[in-house]
Amino acid sequence: MNNSASVLDPAGALSRSDELAAAGLWDDAIRLLTEANRNEERSDVERRLLKLRHLAFAEMKDSVPVPVWPKPVPDYFPQETSIPEIHASELTADIVNSAITHHGSLMVRGMVDPNVAEGIREAIDHAFDSAAEAENPLTPLPPWYLPFRAHRKGDYSFGGPERTYVREGGGLHAVDAPRALFRHIEALSAVGFDRMLRDYFGEPVAFSAKKTTLRRTEPGALAGWHQDGAFLGTETRSLNIWTALSPCGVDAASLDILPRRIDTLVEMGGPDIFDWAISNETAEKYAAKDIVRPVFETGDALLFDQLTLHRTGVDSHMTKTRYAIEMWCFAASTYPHEQIPLCW
């Protein structure tokens, strides 16, 4: 495809993307609108991009999973007893695989440029403020808050209750804030994260509408221990990227995480907690004294999967708001349908 987005006005780009989608050229349609929106951010283009990403998954031919996954890799961090760390310039699928397989997570410093992170934070603030002003969770207030509509043929559940639940936890679905999500995807693509994902899974990649979340966490927020495999299943091939958009771990909440691999779901439930949550007693049994609370600078990211034991890491002395984006990505062949897929 040529770079026609550089000469097409937004209306022309939207029209041409429809033609490409109708011809089954989904990647070209997404690329065209991405280039158009780089030139001029527009809410109609951003919203159409999300629709195309969602419809493209529905039209995708059956993705074939890699027979052996994850592939066997050596431990590239044999002396590490905490969370392995690399810089974004060192990011490869083998490094991620090694860290997740042998240590349970990987810290990637400098994943997002701090100046770019500032623009994403701005979009997050606008999105949260617009969502608060909306008459109800499904009322759009462009350009910052545009509730996403899943394809009706997918039999998805994604209405007001799901959004209210996430809001009560200090979050906002990123698909409801297309500009913030667009800026975030652009930032990750700038360091090759999209290519790394394809190499990591060995097949096309999708991210989740329900579990890609903007975080604006106020001081004092609490969240219990959990493994996301309680929602996603243990056989799903997943990778979460948790990106700090402000400093975290000193004056603002971070994450508490077990820096070693667990291959199963641990015992869940207990008095006064959700049936998917893990009690402090159970977490301590598995973690002993190994729990780590990493310190993030703006733009650092933590990678982990659905078996990683973690929670929000917060203390009473933390007085600043935490900004972050959590983005769950999946191998297309094992995508958990109820999470509502969008192609990368």
Region annotations inferred by a language model:
Residues 1-102:
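Fe(II)/2-oxoglutarate
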Residues 225-242:
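Acidic, His- and aromatic-enriched active-site or binding-groove loops in soluble protein domains
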Residues 240-243, 319-335:
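A short hydrophobic beta-strand segment most commonly corresponding to one strand
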